[in-house]
């Protein structure tokens, strides 16, 4: 099969392929970018595979960087663009179900494609637009099926993260998992305990943000993979609560998705749960803030202080999630209340601790912090104007 029109992302990278071929080697576009081109989906990263060994690749191009040369990858700098060029390779026995004990460079495209995870990710595309399809991936693409390359159990034993990737691809593409592939995934889910939490988080996060997240999550639940994820053992019934969200609902952000997950799981200690997933502090705080906003909304409308406390984006994401839960919402009222605030950050207050110490005799400590907070909330509540005259008058009254 030949692409009738080469996507612009590939056209831009063609000079790299052509230079490698002029040097006497093979070179192809590979991986998800080829799949996305065939599906007419947006193309993100353009990856190139070649028969040239890393040192040979570096001799072809004047500007390169070693980013994973032990695995055969050289970063080629072509004008303003950067491309990862990786040597065809085979992999030895995998250690800990996550990484090969050794990588061997080869000259064979077929040997390289054999080690890919799913047939729809095992395409190669040459400079003429010709598709190399050694594992009937085009047929699977047509049937919208996710099938492991070769023997499914071998692929998942090599790298157990591929199990989570299978659920994630199902969520992003909306494809069905081929029965033997899914059977192997279900059998080998205990291997997920060998995968780093960080890698698992990335795949689970992508699953939740995907347009067909319900399909991916349903397969994950059916496989009982959750039993091998941090703090999620025996959580099937609670995970199913996510399916109570509106049918066509998709998450706006990772923070919103994980807030929904914690809501579904009825997690009492969000901080501990997110720590077990090794998320960043900033991410954990935003997820917890969303949960706090949701709890506040359960008790009625948000106050001015509530709107001041949180970023408007989080306030609206919480409202969006409430709507998906089938609850009453009023995003316009929240936006108007937020916009009506005199200040949105205490740094905007027209007085500071230094002035209070110098002009009013306050000493650093709890009393100073207390009066500053009092001024801050008086301004937020609309009881005090945010200008020096008004604040000084307020302070004189306090004295």
UniProtKB/Swiss-Prot annotation:
One of its GO terms (molecular function) is tRNA binding. The keyword Glycoprotein does not apply. Keywords: ATP-binding, Magnesium, Metal-binding, Nucleotide-binding, Nucleotidyltransferase, RNA repair, RNA-binding, Transferase, tRNA processing. Its cofactor is Mg(2+). It comes from the Bacteria. It is an enzyme of class 2 (transferase). The keyword DNA repair does not apply. ATP binds at residues 32, 35, 116, 159, 162, 165, 168. Pfam families: PolyA_pol, PolyA_pol_RNAbd, tRNA_NucTran2_2. CTP binds at residues 32, 35, 116, 159, 162, 165, 168. It catalyses: a tRNA precursor + 2 CTP + ATP = a tRNA with a 3' CCA end + 3 diphosphate; a tRNA with a 3' CCA end + 2 CTP + ATP = a tRNA with a 3' CCACCA end + 3 diphosphate. Disulfide bonds: none annotated. GO terms for biological process: RNA repair; tRNA 3'-terminal CCA addition. Its EC number is 2.7.7.72. InterPro entries: Bact_CCA-adding_enz_type3_sf, CCA-adding_enz_C, CCA-adding_enz_firmicutes, NT_sf, PolA_pol_head_dom, PolyA_RNA-bd. Mg(2+) binds at residues 45, 47. Homodimer. A single active site specifically recognizes both ATP and CTP and is responsible for their addition. Catalyzes the addition and repair of the essential 3'-terminal CCA sequence in tRNAs without using a nucleic acid template. Adds these three nucleotides in the order of C, C, and A to the tRNA nucleotide-73, using CTP and ATP as substrates and producing inorganic pyrophosphate. tRNA 3'-terminal CCA addition is required both for tRNA processing and repair. Also involved in tRNA surveillance by mediating tandem CCA addition to generate a CCACCA at the 3' terminus of unstable tRNAs. While stable tRNAs receive only 3'-terminal CCA, unstable tRNAs are marked with CCACCA and rapidly degraded. Belongs to the tRNA nucleotidyltransferase/poly(A) polymerase family. Bacterial CCA-adding enzyme type 3 subfamily. This is CCA-adding enzyme. The lineage of its organism: Bacteria, Bacillati, Bacillota, Bacilli, Lactobacillales.
């Amino acid at each position: 099969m030949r692409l009738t029109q080469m996507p612009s992302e590939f056209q831009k990278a063609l000079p790299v392929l052509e230079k490698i071929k002029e040097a006497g080697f093979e070179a192809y576009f590979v991986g998800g970018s080829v799949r996305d081109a065939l599906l007419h989906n947006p193309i993100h990263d353009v990856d190139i595979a070649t028969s040239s060994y890393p040192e040979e690749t570096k001799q072809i191009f004047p500007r390169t960087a070693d980013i994973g040369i032990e695995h055969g990858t050289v970063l080629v700098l072509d004008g303003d663009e950067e491309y990862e060029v990786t040597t065809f390779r085979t992999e030895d026995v995998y250690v800990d179900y996550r990484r090969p004990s050794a990588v061997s460079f080869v000259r064979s495209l077929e040997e390289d494609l054999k080690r890919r995870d799913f047939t729809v990710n095992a395409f190669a595309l040459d400079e003429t637009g010709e598709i190399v399809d050694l594992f009937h991936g085009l047929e699977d693409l047509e049937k919208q099926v996710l099938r492991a390359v070769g023997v499914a159990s071998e692929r998942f034993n090599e790298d157990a993260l591929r199990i989570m990737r299978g659920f994630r691809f199902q969520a992003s593409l909306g494809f069905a998992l081929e029965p033997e592939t899914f059977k192997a995934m279900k059998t080998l889910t205990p291997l997920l305990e060998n995968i780093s939490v960080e890698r698992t988080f990335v795949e689970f996060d992508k699953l939740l943000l995907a347009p067909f997240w319900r399909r991916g999550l349903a397969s994950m639940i059916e496989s009982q993979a959750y039993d091998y994820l941090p703090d999620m053992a025996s959580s099937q019934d609670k995970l199913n609560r996510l399916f109570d969200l509106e049918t066509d609902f998709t998450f706006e952000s990772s923070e919103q998705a994980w807030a929904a997950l914690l809501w579904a799981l009825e997690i009492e200690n969000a901080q501990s749960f997110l720590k077990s997933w090794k998320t960043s502090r900033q991410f954990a705080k935003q997820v917890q803030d969303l949960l706090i906003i949701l709890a506040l909304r359960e008790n009625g409308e948000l106050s001015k202080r509530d709107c001041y406390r949180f970023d408007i984006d989080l306030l609206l994401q919480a409202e969006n999630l409430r709507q998906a839960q089938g609850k009453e919402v009023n995003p316009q009222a929240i936006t108007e209340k937020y916009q009506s605030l005199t200040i949105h950050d205490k740094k905007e207050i027209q007085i500071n601790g230094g002035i209070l110490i110098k002009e009013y005799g306050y000493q650093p400590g709890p009393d100073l912090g207390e009066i500053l907070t009092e001024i801050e909330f008086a301004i937020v509540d609309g009881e005090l104007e945010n200008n020096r005259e008004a604040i000084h008058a307020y302070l004189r009254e306090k004295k």
